[in-house]
Regions:
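N-terminal anchoring/stem segment of glycosyltransferases
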Residues: 1-82
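Well-ordered, non-membrane alpha-helical segments in soluble/globular domains
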Residues: 20-24, 69, 97-106, 170-179
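Conserved nucleotide-sugar donor-binding
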Residues: 80, 146-163
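Short, high-confidence coil segments that cap the C-terminus of an alpha-helix
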Residues: 80, 111-114, 185
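Short beta-strand-to-loop acidic/aromatic patch adjacent to the donor-nucleotide binding site
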Residues: 81-93
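Conserved donor-nucleotide/metal-binding helix-loop-beta segment in metal-dependent transferases, i.e.
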Residues: 94-124
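Short, flexible, basic/aromatic active-site loop/helix in glycosyltransferases
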Residues: 128-143
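C-terminal catalytic/acceptor-binding lobe
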Residues: 164-250
Length: 250
């Protein structure tokens, strides 16, 4: 049976040190019957060494490919109409429900939405009434741009993005990409009551902490992140701490 939505996790061996937390938190919070695709570079000698769950569908990409080509490589093997996409350092900290994700996909399909970001910002919520989700205090908001992840993409739109555009992972939100997405029907979802304090950690569809920004730990933004990583015996002392990345809310 073809799932309505699947999860695609893009990874790189350079950040494999974060995988224990990603896998542990996914095992803890994501419903077991969610289809998960794990995309990693072919320079890794033994993926089994990293204890990636057996039921995750594993794909490799060639290291010399640009980011959009790496991701585009896997679309033919994903059959779901919608894809929840994230990179390896966006760590879930709350329930990731298959039922809720499927209900959200139904809303997207009924309204011809192409993309739904898992959180928003008070600069958006302060200027719109929003559309009630059916879940207390959570509303959908129209967006005129995109933040790449974690977000639900219509499969065909995500594939078009990665086919038409030729981008590195540091360029996938540049002006050309923003212009492309402004021609699509893009939305966001947010808890209106907590948008000023907890917009990513209180996400309806993928509560999370973004562990790394520009290669530095996001301990300033997420004070509880270090304790979480320490619980997975991840070395948090070998790189610095980011001091300014989106500190207005968690």
């Amino acid at each position: 049976m073809i799932p309505k939505i699947s999860i695609l996790i893009y990874t790189h061996s350079e950040y494999s040190f974060i995988w224990p937390a990603l896998v542990g938190q996914m095992n803890k919070y994501a419903d077991e019957d969610l289809e998960v695709h794990f995309l990693y570079n072919d320079t890794i000698d033994d993926i089994n060494f990293h204890n990636i769950p057996e039921n995750w569908i594993k794909h490799t990409y060639q290291e010399d490919l640009i980011w959009t080509k790496r991701v585009n490589h896997v679309f033919s093997e994903i059959k779901s109409e919608y894809i929840l996409f994230l990179h390896e350092d966006w760590i879930p900290i709350g329930q990731v429900s298959k039922k809720l994700l499927e209900e959200t996909c139904d809303v997207m399909s009924d309204n011809s939405w192409d993309y739904l970001l898992s959180y928003s910002h008070f600069s958006v919520t302060d200027n719109q009434d929003g559309i009630f989700t059916g879940h207390e205090d959570y509303y959908f908001y129209k967006s005129d741009s995109h933040i790449f992840q974690p977000a639900i993409w219509k499969h065909s739109v995500f594939e078009e993005f990665c086919t038409v555009l030729n981008k590195t992972k540091h360029q996938n939100e540049d002006q050309e990409c923003l212009a492309f997405m402004r021609n699509k029907n893009t939305y966001e979802v947010q808890n209106l009551k907590t948008v000023r304090e907890y917009r990513t950690t209180n996400s309806l569809i993928f509560p999370h902490m973004h562990a790394l920004a520009e290669g530095l730990w996001n301990f300033t933004k997420y004070p509880s992140l270090k304790e979480l990583l320490d619980s997975y015996e991840i070395d948090t002392n070998s790189r610095g701490v980011h001091t300014w990345w989106e500190l207005d809310t968690q």
